[in-house]
């Protein structure tokens, strides 16, 4: 009987072991199935092949600060110069088709409306004003030469300039004293009241942008010896400015070649320290040259010109651009000549405009570079 119960006990223990083994196997199967479900499909394949199946866990960390961009202090200064401007009539006489008739009928913005978009985009626009602005009845001064001309208009004609983004004028020419001291003083007062900068034979215009200062020295240039006084003024201006421009008035009228004395004088002015030299007075274009690295423009021609019904119908705007790098340091200058018509009608309608015709435009550019004898 004892052996009987021992056999039964052994059998029960064996069954328990079998059950335990089965339970363990089932547990392992469940674990494996669970792992297989959550792991990537190629896990076991990679495991067999020996490929790594490690998962890289990204740990959040403080991002490295991006380096601050270097400050960019680059900029440019763009200036536009236009030539002989007479917004008036001979002795202030109004006749059919005259400038005065147009000025009485048209809004001031009419005269320069085709050029204004250029002036609006620059930093400073400067023209040569060749008439008296006064509402007084003044007597023309006597001249000891013939033919002589006197130009005067109502003071409100200054709005032709201010309405079209002109910022400064040279009142340094042979017409500033057409009506004596009274006419001169009235004109200066009108210019100042309009908020325009102005230069005279003794007063220099200064324009500043981002602490860079440009001087515009205006003067008559009727003989070579006048260059000495201009050079003196250039040197004085250089003590308080960074870039010196000379805008002179002189030479023989209605000829396309600059006088020999004017060429010699302009070159002396460059040797005396001027950074740019620009001329006016001939009422026609004269070419430019580069002398010792400095540009000389001998005549810009007319601009808005009320002095004649049929003046030569070519002129230029001269634009100069000074460039500054990221550190705000001056790096050099470049220029552009913009060929224009003095008027756009069959006769003078006192409304200059940019030349669009490519052949006519190129003719003017070739003339200014000395390649042809006439801009027409």
Regions found by a protein language model. Name each.
Residues 12-16:
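Membrane-interface segments at the starts/ends of alpha-helical transmembrane spans
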Residues 2-3, 18-376:
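Acidic, metal/ion-coordinating pockets
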Residues 1-11:
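N-terminal targeting leaders characterized by basic, low-complexity, disordered sequences
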């Amino acid at each position: 009987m004892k052996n009987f119960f021992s056999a039964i006990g052994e059998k029960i223990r064996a069954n328990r072991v079998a059950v335990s083994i089965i339970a363990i196997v089932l547990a392992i199967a469940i674990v494996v199935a669970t792992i297989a479900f959550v792991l990537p499909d190629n896990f076991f394949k990679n495991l067999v092949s020996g490929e790594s199946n490690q998962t890289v866990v990204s740990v959040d960390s403080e991002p490295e600060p991006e380096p601050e961009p270097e400050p960019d202090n680059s900029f440019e200064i763009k200036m536009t110069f236009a030539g002989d401007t007479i917004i008036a009539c001979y002795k202030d006489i109004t006749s059919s088709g005259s400038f005065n008739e147009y000025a009485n009928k048209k809004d001031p913005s009419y005269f320069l409306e085709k050029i204004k978009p250029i002036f609006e985009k620059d930093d400073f626009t400067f023209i040569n004003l060749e008439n008296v602005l006064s509402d007084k009845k003044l007597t023309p001064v006597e001249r000891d030469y013939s033919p002589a001309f006197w130009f005067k208009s109502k003071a409100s004609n200054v709005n032709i300039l201010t309405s079209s983004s002109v910022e400064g004028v040279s009142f340094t020419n042979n017409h500033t004293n057409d009506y004596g001291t009274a006419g001169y003083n009235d004109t200066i007062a009108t210019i100042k009241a309009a908020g325009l900068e102005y230069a005279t034979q003794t007063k220099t215009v200064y324009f500043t942008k981002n602490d860079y200062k440009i001087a515009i020295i205006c003067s008559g240039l009727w003989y070579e010896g006048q260059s000495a006084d201009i050079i003196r003024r250039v040197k004085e201006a250089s003590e308080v400015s960074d870039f010196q421009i000379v805008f002179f008035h002189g030479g023989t009228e209605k000829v396309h070649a600059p006088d020999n004395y004017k060429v010699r004088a302009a070159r002396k002015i460059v040797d005396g320290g001027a950074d740019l030299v620009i001329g006016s007075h001939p009422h026609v274009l004269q070419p430019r040259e580069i002398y010792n690295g400095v540009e000389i423009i001998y005549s810009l021609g007319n601009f808005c010109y009320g002095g004649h019904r049929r003046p030569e119908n070519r002129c230029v705007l001269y634009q100069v651009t000074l460039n500054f790098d990221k550190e705000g340091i001056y790096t050099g200058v470049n220029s552009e000549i913009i060929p224009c018509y003095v008027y756009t009608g069959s006769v003078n309608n006192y409304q200059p405009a940019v030349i669009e015709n490519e052949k006519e435009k190129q003719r003017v550019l070739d003339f200014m570079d000395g390649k042809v004898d006439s801009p027409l």
